[in-house]
C-alpha cells in the first residue's frame, strides 16, 4: 500500500472557513498520520477510535489513521518519516529496540496501548483441545507483516515447537479473513491476541460457537523462562461471547510509537490530550481502558524509550518523578 510521505510534522491548516478559529484567528492545527494495520484486525479498530477520541478532545489536532500491512511495515514507515505515529505489537517493538535481526531503532513510545494475551480459537465442535493437538493442522497465524505470527513463533519455541514445521502455517493477506477460514474448515484454528479482539469476537458470536486454546500452566512457565519479555496474562471471563471462565496465557504489550524526530512539544500535547481522554477512549473500546500513563511506565521495556515530550507530561502529573 502506498502511503504519501509526511511533508512536515505539524501542518498549518488555513482552509478558509473550515479552519479552526479562536477569537477570529486561525489556530495551528497539527496533522498527525497514524499507521494501523490491515482491515478487520484489532489495530484499525483501536486506531480509528484513538483518532476520533483525540480529535474530539482537541480541535487543533487532526490524527489521520492509515491502513498499512501492520507492525513490520509501520516501523520502517516511521523511520523514514512517512508516518508520525504507528501501532506496533510488542514482539516487533522488542526486536526493533534490541536490534534483533536489524539495527536498533531510535523510535520512541508515546503510550502503551493494551496487553495482548495470545491464544488459539477453534470451532466449538472441534476435536482439538491443546496446542499439541493442533500439530500437523493448518493454522492461521495472522496477517503477513503483523506482530501476531511473531508472538506465536516465540510462544511455540518456548515449548519446543516450530511454527512452520510442526504446523501447516497460513499467513493472511487481511486480518479479517481468519474467522471465515475457521468456520468453513480451511484452517483448524486461528491465532490471535487481546481482549475484545475482532476475530475472536466474530467466531465466539457465530452459530458454530468457539473454544479457546491457550498454553497450560507448565507451558506458560517454560515460555517465560526462555523468552522473559513475554508475560503471564489473563483473559477475564466475559471478554468474548459465551466465555464463562478466565483464560490464563502469555502475551505482550502493544505500543503507539512515534518517529524519532517528533517534536517534544507535539508529543507533550498528544500525551496531555490522551491522559484527559482516557475515560472517553475506555468507553468506546474495552481494551483501550489499559491505555494509561501508569501502564505506559510499567509496560515500557526501558523508560528511556518513552518520548521525552511524553515524559515531561508524566512528570508534571506525578506519574514519574
Model-flagged regions — what are they?
Residues 15-17:
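N-terminal signal peptide c-region/cleavage motif recognized by signal peptidases
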Residues 31-57, 61, 115-184, 279, ...:
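Bilobed "Venus flytrap"/periplasmic-binding protein-like clamshell domains
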Residues 48-52, 64-104, 120, 176-182, ...:
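Pocket-flanking alpha-helical
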Residues 90-92, 126-127, 163-262:
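Pocket-lining segment of extracytoplasmic ligand-binding domains
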Residues 102-113, 239-248:
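A structural signal for short loop-to-beta-strand junctions that line the ligand-binding cleft
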Residues 141-155, 230-299:
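Ligand-binding clefts/hinges and TM-proximal coupling segments of bilobed small-molecule sensing domains
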Residues 177, 184-185, 194-212, 222-229, ...:
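An extracytoplasmic/periplasmic, membrane-proximal ligand-sensing/linker region
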Amino acid at each position: 500500500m502506498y502511503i504519501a510521505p509526511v511533508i512536515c510534522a505539524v501542518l498549518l491548516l488555513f482552509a478558509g472557513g473550515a479552519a479552526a478559529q479562536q477569537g477570529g484567528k486561525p489556530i495551528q492545527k497539527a496533522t498527525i498520520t497514524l499507521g494501523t494495520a490491515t482491515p478487520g484486525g484489532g489495530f484499525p479498530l483501536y486506531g480509528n477510535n484513538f483518532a476520533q477520541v483525540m480529535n474530539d478532545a482537541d480541535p487543533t489536532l487532526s490524527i489521520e489513521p492509515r491502513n498499512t500491512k501492520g507492525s513490520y511495515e509501520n516501523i520502517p514507515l516511521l523511520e523514514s518519516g512517512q508516518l508520525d505515529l504507528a501501532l506496533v505489537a510488542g514482539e516487533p517493538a522488542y526486536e526493533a529496540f534490541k536490534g534483533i535481526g536489524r539495527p536498533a531503532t531510535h523510535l520512541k513510545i508515546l503510550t502503551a496501548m493494551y496487553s495482548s494475551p495470545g491464544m488459539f480459537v477453534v470451532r466449538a465442535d472441534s476435536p482439538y483441545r491443546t496446542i499439541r493437538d493442533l500439530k500437523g493442522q493448518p493454522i492461521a497465524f495472522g496477517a503477513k507483516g503483523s506482530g501476531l505470527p511473531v508472538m506465536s513463533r516465540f510462544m511455540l519455541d518456548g515449548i519446543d515447537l516450530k511454527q512452520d514445521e510442526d504446523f501447516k502455517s497460513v499467513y493472511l493477506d487481511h486480518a479479517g479473513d481468519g474467522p471465515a477460514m475457521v468456520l468453513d474448515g480451511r484452517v483448524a484454528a486461528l491465532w490471535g491476541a487481546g481482549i475484545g479482539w475482532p476475530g475472536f469476537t466474530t467466531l465466539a458470536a457465530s452459530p458454530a460457537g468457539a473454544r479457546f486454546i491457550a498454553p497450560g500452566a507448565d507451558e506458560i512457565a517454560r515460555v517465560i523462562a526462555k523468552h522473559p519479555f513475554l508475560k503471564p496474562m489473563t483473559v477475564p471471563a466475559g471478554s468474548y461471547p459465551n466465555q464463562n471462565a478466565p483464560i490464563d496465557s502469555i502475551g505482550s504489550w502493544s505500543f503507539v510509537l512515534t518517529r524519532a524526530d517528533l517534536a517534544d512539544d507535539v508529543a507533550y500535547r498528544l500525551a496531555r490530550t490522551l491522559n484527559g481522554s482516557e475515560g472517553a477512549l475506555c468507553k468506546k473500546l474495552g481494551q483501550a481502558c489499559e491505555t494509561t500513563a501508569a501502564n505506559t511506565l510499567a509496560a515500557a521495556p526501558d523508560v528511556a524509550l518513552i518520548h521525552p515530550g511524553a515524559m515531561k507530561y508524566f512528570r508534571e502529573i506525578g506519574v514519574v518523578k
